[in-house]
């Protein structure tokens, strides 16, 4: 892996180990490269992968367009987060399990006052979820379910009977993105990460609550009708983000884009 941006001593042609040589980065180096803002303000970032022709999935899953370096970054972003938000459809399709504690991040998380692993927060309007799965019954830290006040009462009851904390973050059937963020922050989860899917990310984009996008560009073409990284109603005025970091490995590009004025 090599750093392309920002241009620093590490990206010059200076000979030696600090040059932009193609090598595997340590988890500590990745953690520094993807650190949250140090001032403690709430921060919502998304982590997504896309092909050259804009597909966010292949055969319904993201794994087919990912790579080992992308998965290292995926693990790093989880290792830094207080909470991971995921849409119910993505949780089902990708077979989400409880986040695990990783020794490589233990000291860093303890120093930041974080638990041993990030909380998984599943976003669902209908709560069509199997609450007997390990994600809900055997997590290291309790899983949350975010929904609206109009969610089916029997499914809310089923979740609570399984010991799941149901967080109401909207007056209708689904969540209101800004309210969901506020509910998480109120629980001390200021370092927020969403892994999609496209529908959930589209909601955050449309509501203007996304602070950062970590986007992997996979050097493949898939054609077909796969979703983009964000779907749903469009925004009236496109919101501008600025490129803050760019890494490369084996043709994959790993970018960070921050909302203008919040970098």
Regions found by a protein language model. Give the residues of each.
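Enzymes that bind and transform nitrogen-containing heteroaromatic metabolites
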Residues: 1-263
């Amino acid at each position: 892996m090599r750093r392309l941006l920002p241009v620093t001593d590490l990206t010059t042609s200076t000979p030696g180990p600090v040059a932009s040589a193609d090598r595997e980065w340590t988890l500590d180096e990745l953690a520094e490269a993807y650190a949250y803002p140090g001032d403690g303000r709430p921060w919502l970032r998304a982590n997504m992968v896309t092909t050259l022709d804009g597909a966010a999935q292949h055969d319904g899953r993201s794994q087919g367009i990912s790579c080992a370096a992308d998965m290292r970054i995926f693990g790093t972003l989880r290792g830094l987060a207080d909470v991971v938000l995921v849409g119910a459809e993505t949780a089902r399709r990708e077979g989400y399990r409880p986040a695990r504690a990783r020794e490589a991040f233990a000291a860093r998380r303890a120093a930041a006052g974080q638990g041993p692993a990030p909380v998984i927060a599943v976003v669902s309007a209908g709560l069509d979820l199997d609450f007997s799965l390990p994600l809900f019954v055997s997590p290291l830290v309790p899983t949350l379910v975010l929904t609206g006040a109009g969610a089916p009462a029997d499914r809310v009851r089923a979740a609570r009977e399984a010991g799941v904390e149901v967080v109401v973050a909207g007056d209708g059937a689904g969540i209101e993105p800004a309210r969901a963020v506020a509910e998480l922050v109120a629980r001390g989860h200021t370092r927020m990460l969403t892994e999609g899917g496209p529908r959930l990310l589209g909601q955050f984009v449309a509501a203007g609550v996304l602070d950062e996008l970590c986007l992997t560009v996979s050097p493949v073409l898939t054609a077909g009708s796969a979703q983009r990284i964000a779907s749903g109603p469009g925004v009236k005025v496109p919101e501008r983000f600025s490129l803050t970091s760019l890494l490369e490995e084996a043709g994959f590009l790993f970018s960070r884009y921050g909302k203008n004025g919040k970098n």
